[in-house]
Amino acid sequence: MTRSLRVLYIGLFLVLLLALGAWSLRSFFGFSTNADATVLNGRWTKAVETHYDEEFPIKRLGTNLWAALDYKLFNEGRPGVVLGRDHWLYSDEEFNPAVNEDQNLEGNYALVEGVRQKLKAQGIQLVMAIVPAKVRLYPEHLGEVKPASIHANLYQDFHARVAADKIIAPDLLGPLQQAKLGGKQVFLRTDTHWTPDGAEIAAKQLAKTIADKTPLNGEPQRFVTEAEKTEPHKGDLRLFLPLDPLFENLMPPKEPLEKRVTHLAETKGDDALFSDSETPVALVGTSYSANPNWNFVGALKQALGSDVISYAEDGHGPILPMLSYLKSDDFKNNPPQVLIWEFPERYLPVNNEIGDADPSWVAQLKQAGSRQQNMALNTPVNHQKSETPDRAQN
């Protein structure tokens, strides 16, 4: 390479670098940080570095190119998603084996029973809403990747264990399968979660079981659900395919999502069912309950004919929100008649986070539940009708 070519090469490289840097600097117009981010505590510098790193075009270009190669050549996304056929995406939590899965299973079974005892001591009836895995309802869209063996009978085994502990837990899989056969989409194609239709079906099944086995006090209230609007929904599983903006056309298409809202029908003041101090039904759970996109809380209100106070949390699994609720003032001072615990089956074989809960207290809950389960295993089985789903449904 001659000296002139070297100079030209270096010059072009510097021009390209300066151009890309200038492009990135455009993003700082209007950029601001939180009030607590200062130069002295280092947070301002960190915020600037993070913002620049996110906006630097070379990084975005490289990320998009690598993701496109993975997606088109190997039919793979980032860890977190499993690609199916027909643009269907699944959470890899429904497929992967878990570290110490057998130990986690027993620990979580014991914790559920320990929670039941804690609630019973407060006069609260526990009702489990075990959410079946999306792959259990839509296996026909799977590609070559199959769930690990631990997931095969997880839903049915979960029901069998809570039935042995005499915990009310209606089968949600059967009604969801029937609705699917009837033409309704009960889980979103590119999202982990159920559709508003799926949430409504689950709510109706829960309400029917509660009415049969632990009826609510008082006269029912009338709630009305209305469709607000239908919008294109960017499923949470699409985030594991970082193809936009350069290869947006390769992404599984967005799907329409009907937003619904539920409100109390207009009634006379004398018709109020519960006073302000009463809580007929509480709900603890995950994003299946907490995210308003699915309107699960609203569907429960309408199906139960009762107000529902939600303590569900997004992004923390089913265990942490329950532990937080058991330590709350509402649990101590205003206990509900019924508490619905929404618990996706995929969280059962994993070591769930407990946040800032005292580990010794959590261990005590598990020990109490384990003792009760050991007693149940040593008690002769009374053959009676159970809501445990048939394994043949899987």
UniProtKB/Swiss-Prot annotation:
Residues at the active site: 191, 193, 287
GO MF annotations in UniProt: acyltransferase activity
EC assignment: 2.3.1.-
Membrane topology: Peripheral membrane protein
KW Membrane (keyword) present: yes
Disulfide bonds: none
Function: Together with AlgI and AlgF, forms an inner membrane complex which probably interacts with the alginate polymerization-transport complex and adds acetyl groups at the O-2 and O-3 positions of mannuronate residues. Acetylation of alginate is important for the architecture of biofilms and increases the ability of alginate to act as a defense barrier.
Name this protein carries in UniProt: Probable alginate O-acetylase AlgJ
Gene this chain is encoded by: algJ
